Amino acid sequence: MGKKGRRPRAARRERERELRREVREREDLAARLPGGSPQRPIEVATPAVVEVRAAATACVQCGGELGVVEHAVERRGDETLRVVRAICRRCHAPRSIYFRLARPLPS
């Protein structure tokens, strides 16, 4: 008699664990990208470009388009950051993107 194959439920659970691990890895990588965390904000010249830049950013999970849900101001110590909360229109993965306004150059 031959070796039994893997049960369908066990194979499905293994695949689900693998997919969750891949999602965690992509989220960890996204946190290291510019704008992925408050420690790595994207520098912009004016608040007017914050939502445009956020909407132009691709989803880290599926590459889809992000839809801006909220554009807020957060204080982190003595620094003021802009944070855009967005959701992917394709896979519905949430994402926060951090921005810092560039200091104006002296005239």
Where does each model-flagged region fall?
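Short linker/helix segments within small regulatory modules
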Residues: A72-V83
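Short cysteine-rich clusters marking metal-coordination/redox-active sites
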Residues: C59-C62, C88-C91
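Residues immediately within or flanking Cys/His clusters that coordinate Zn2+
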Residues: A55-A56, L81, R85
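Cys/His-rich microdomains that often coordinate metals
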Residues: E65-L66, R95
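Intrinsic low-complexity, intrinsically disordered or marginally ordered coil/linker segments
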Residues: I42-V44, V60, E65, V73, ...
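Short Cys/His-rich "knuckle" micro-motifs
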Residues: V69-A72, Y98-R100
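Short, intrinsically disordered terminal segments enriched in charged and Pro/Gly residues
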Residues: M1-R53, F99-S107
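Residue-level recognition of well-ordered beta-strand positions that form the cores
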Residues: R85-I87, R100
